[in-house]
């Protein structure tokens, strides 16, 4: 039956689950690709040399084949329900070709008939606006097809971007007597994950067809099973992301009470999860009691336990507010308490105190050493948050004079120990619960610019200063930072991410300027000191003009990021010459097939990155143009969740051609050679007139040596980290094969603390500087 969309819907018979009605499904063949970093892609398998891909009917996801952990043929195969709509065509319908390039794409809201007005600009006349009507001609739970009403326009969109009420309204047009079609609607909702709508549709069917209650009760049970299973997956992810148990438990208990229609097996899984949460809670309560007992016992007999109450309070606060993040530091404490030979409260408290203040690698049962580590932790924490250089100098003197007890006598605090302790430093300020549901505006502290540098920050519900949270920096040059961040906040809150949105205070398009980059860098550094951000899990992201900047910024500052996320960004100016820096920072790039330059510039460039086995993932939306692609955000978070910044590098190769793009793992270009750096206004569109400086370094741990080669650099500062160099042995720094420094490295506590207070990066710390001129 085929009738106009204003009156009726016709169908394309397909089926996903077949839970309660036997119909032969129209199977869609798809493979399942599991990446080594954890994310999963599903689609028809494609292959071009070393580049593999998954096409799901809406988009094509490309990646280097060697980055796959597994490919399961047919494991992603599904049979999706779909509904075809008969939409009108104007009498003057033009059957010409679609535009080959789409720019300036905007769209109005979908109306009740599944249509919307869209506008775009021809690439050769951007001042002109072309308007047409798009109409939905096929609804699917994951993807829906559209065509033009006035002219030929064939495309597809993710169903998730179509308002749910529009789709429900269209499907509600099916006549009440069409039982089988209404059952397919239930399956459609279930496949889309719309459980509320699926349950409402089943209830309506039960009212209209009471004779089929047994079948419909089975259908309802399937819906409850799917909903409860999905909720449990979400709750487990939230717990892992730091959402407190006190938030999850009431939701789980309420759901179990209202999900009486779920099967016994799925309800048992839910009850098992609740039991596990309660058991974990009891275990945590026991640990808190044991921790307090160890602290109290260590002070009996006037034992010199040193600093205690503030650390005990901090540990209890962390274990109560962000247990998933804090608990790993108490593994040595838990293990010691199970010692069959007996337990000493003093040793137990020493282990807890040293692991908390210095990390697992510094855990010790020697209370004197633990107290020294605690003093170093307190000193470094205060210095990291002190804006006064004179105060930091006093803290530096304290660290220099600090002695660590040992079997062969006291010794100074080592650079390695200071590095490990610094990783435990957390912000001092605590956010109240009500601020966790609001967007906060921060002004960069100690900013020397005449115009204050500001940014917006949104923290997840379970945020606490003693935890560590991943962050995404959303860029929107020439636009409102809040508007740019809105699209990211819901998914970020669900997954336990912080969203930062710098106010770039720029007008017009992205300028590729040093000032724009400096604004982002200042905001990141301020946020690292102010908020509990994991510095190894910071990503930069942007769409359209923000995508241009995200691509450019990521390649210009690779050692400060875990990855760059580009939505419809164009690789202009510095990006093509900087492509080699992709080996240091992963990229996730999303483009429309009809975006300007996609087939000529973007796709070929990204393929070269994959061919070199650099970590680049490319998503190409079919028959889509220069758009934001908000529907890709959940996949982006999946991709980002498995990636961390490269900190302990053995070697790197980098290029740079702009003032400000000068820091690479402690090697800082302090002066370019003439002609090797250009201001953005002097750079060609694709950077053909750039001759970037090159910098490469190899950290040879066995020889305690740094081997550097460079071209186009007049002066270089080398900051030394205990991650690459052993400060207890002689060090050799070579440039171009010639030794430029040879001798014992010496810790400069003032430089260490000044750098930490400036950048706020607790994972990349430096203790000595060597200047090469």
Model-flagged regions — what are they?
Residues 663-773:
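C-terminal beta-sandwich/jelly-roll accessory domains of carbohydrate-active enzymes
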């Amino acid at each position: 039956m085929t009738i106009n969309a204003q009156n009726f819907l016709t169908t394309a018979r397909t089926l996903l689950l077949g839970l309660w009605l036997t119909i032969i499904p129209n199977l869609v063949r798809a493979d399942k690709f599991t990446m080594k970093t954890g994310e999963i892609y599903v689609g028809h398998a494609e292959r071009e040399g070393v580049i593999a891909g998954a096409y799901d009917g809406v988009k094509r996801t490309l990646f280097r084949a060697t980055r796959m952990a597994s490919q399961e043929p047919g494991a992603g195969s599904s049979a999706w329900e779909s509904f075809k709509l008969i939409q009108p065509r104007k009498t003057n319908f033009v059957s010409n070709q679609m535009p080959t390039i789409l720019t300036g794409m905007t769209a109005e809201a979908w109306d009740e008939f599944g249509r919307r007005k869209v506008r775009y600009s021809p690439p050769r006349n951007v001042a002109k606006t072309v308007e047409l009507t798009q109409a939905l001609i096929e609804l699917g739970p994951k993807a829906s097809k559209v065509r033009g009403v006035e002219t030929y326009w064939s495309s597809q969109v993710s169903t998730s971007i179509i308002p749910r009420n529009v789709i429900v309204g269209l499907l509600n047009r099916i006549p009440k007597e069409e039982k089988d079609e209404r059952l397919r609607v239930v399956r459609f909702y279930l496949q889309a994950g719309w459980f509320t709508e699926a349950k409402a549709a089943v209830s309506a069917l039960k009212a209209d067809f009471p004779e089929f209650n047994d079948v419909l009760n089975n259908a309802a049970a399937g819906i409850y099973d799917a909903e409860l299973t999905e909720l449990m997956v979400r709750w487990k992810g939230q717990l892992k992301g730091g959402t407190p148990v006190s938030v999850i438990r009431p939701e789980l208990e309420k759901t179990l009470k209202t999900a009486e229609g779920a099967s016994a097996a799925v309800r048992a899984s839910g009850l098992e999860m609740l039991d596990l949460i309660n058991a974990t809670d009891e275990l945590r309560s026991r640990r808190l009691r044991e921790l307090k007992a160890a602290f109290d016992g260590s002070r009996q007999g006037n034992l010199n336990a040193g600093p205690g109450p503030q650390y005990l309070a901090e540990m209890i606060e962390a274990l109560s507010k962000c247990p998933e993040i804090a608990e790993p530091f108490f593994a040595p404490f838990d293990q010691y308490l199970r010692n069959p030979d007996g337990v000493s409260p003093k040793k137990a408290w020493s282990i807890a105190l040293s692991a908390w203040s210095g990390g697992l690698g510094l855990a010790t049962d020697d209370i004197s050493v633990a107290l020294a580590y605690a003093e170093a932790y307190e000193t470094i924490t205060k210095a990291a948050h002190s804006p006064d250089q004179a105060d930091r100098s006093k803290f530096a003197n304290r660290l220099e004079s600090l002695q660590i007890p040992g079997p062969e006598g006291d010794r100074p605090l080592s650079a390695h120990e200071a590095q490990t302790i610094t990783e435990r430093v957390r912000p001092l300020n605590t956010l109240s619960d009500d601020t966790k549901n609001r967007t906060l505006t921060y002004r960069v502290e100690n900013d020397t610019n005449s115009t204050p540098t500001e940014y917006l920050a949104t923290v997840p519900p379970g945020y606490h200063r003693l935890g560590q949270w991943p962050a995404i920096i959303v860029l929107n040059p020439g636009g409102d930072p809040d508007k740019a961040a809105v699209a990211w906040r819901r998914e970020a809150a669900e997954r336990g991410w912080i969203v930062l949105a710098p106010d770039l205070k720029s007008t017009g398009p992205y300028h590729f300027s040093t000032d724009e980059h400096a604004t982002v860098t200042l905001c990141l550094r301020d946020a690292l000191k102010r908020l509990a951000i994991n510095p190894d899990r910071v990503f930069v992201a942007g769409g359209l003009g923000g995508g241009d900047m995200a691509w450019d910024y990521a390649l210009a500052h690779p050692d400060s990021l875990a990855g760059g996320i580009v939505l419809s960004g164009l690789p202009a100016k510095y990006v093509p010459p900087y492509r080699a820096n992709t080996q240091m920072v992963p990229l996730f790039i999303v483009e429309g097939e009809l975006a300007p330059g996609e087939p000529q510039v973007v796709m070929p460039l990204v393929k070269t990155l994959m061919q070199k086995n650099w970590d680049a993932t490319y998503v190409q939306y079919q028959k889509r143009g220069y758009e934001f692609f908000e529907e890709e955000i959940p996949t982006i978070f999946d991709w980002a969740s498995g990636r961390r910044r490269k900190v302990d590098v053995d070697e790197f190769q980098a290029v740079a051609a702009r003032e400000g793009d000068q820091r690479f793992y402690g090697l800082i270009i302090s002066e370019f050679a003439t002609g090797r750096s250009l201001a953005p206004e002097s750079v060609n569109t694709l950077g053909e007139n750039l001759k970037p400086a090159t910098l490469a370094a190899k950290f040879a741990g066995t020889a305690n040596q740094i081997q550097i080669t460079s071209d186009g650099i007049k002066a270089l500062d080398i900051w030394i980290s205990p991650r690459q160099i052993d400060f207890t042995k002689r060090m050799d720094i070579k440039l171009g094969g010639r030794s430029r420094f040879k001798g014992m490295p010496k810790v400069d506590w003032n430089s260490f603390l000044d750098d930490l207070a400036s950048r706020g990066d607790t994972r990349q710390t430096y203790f000595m500087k060597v200047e090469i001129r």
